[in-house]
């Protein structure tokens, strides 16, 4: 049998932490370990059609993948053209036309839970992670049900975020973050300006030649198919309080608070309360599910229904990513 549903008693997959509501992720196993995914493509698609929009995520395990190109074909088999990583916020390496490395932050850094590109008005509906090499220690890709996060956020905070929305401010380059050339995949300023105008991003070229952008985006969103409300933003990640205190103080002393690589405010420009951000981080932590990767695993997520992150790790680790099905708030 292809699909191996999670244990209904505690909703846990082997080492998946118990005590979290809902069967996330749903697990789909190869009938015979090592079978090529191509031999079961139709069954794989049926598993996704039946389960992705209810559980939010599917872990495909024990299927054989030859390389990143084979993974790209797997992601394409669900019927959507794969997306490029436009308006990037983190460093990645492009492996082929539509497959990227996962965020290349140092191994000692945690990447907090987030929905891909929820800092913008455009995002992918589907995202796939393929584990090519497991880290000897750590390196999990934690996930969390964004519907459950929405429900657990204090109603007053949730309403305030929803009403005011969020303004993301980014300062590119100067060796502190991605250059504008990296973020927009171009050396042409006019192309950057065209992209910004099309996507409702305010921009300014600073005296040092670097770029600053501002964009007002959603804090919550309604899934276009299921109609469910989800917590859908990266305020906790972009806010300056997400930086370690020593680094934060050093950055501010050098470039001023207005010049830090990234920050976020309410949509009207007013500051977000630190207590609200700590509450959001606490809810995300309490809702997080984590499981050890196995080499060859593919995790498929509905990007609106499920957030993802990255744990610290030791040793070599390789996880690659593909995205599909563009969605927009405008």
Regions picked out by a protein language model, each given a short descriptive name:
Residues 1-39, 53, 107-113, 122-298, ...:
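Active-site environment of non-heme Fe oxygenases that use a 2-His-1-carboxylate facial triad
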Residues 40-48:
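Short, acidic/polar
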Residues 51-57:
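Short, surface-exposed connector motifs at secondary-structure boundaries
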Residues 65-80:
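Glycine-rich loop at the start of a catalytic domain that most often binds anionic cofactors/ligands
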Residues 79-93, 317-330:
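C-terminal end-helix/capping segment
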Residues 83-115:
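A gly/proline- and charged-residue-enriched helix-loop-helix capping module
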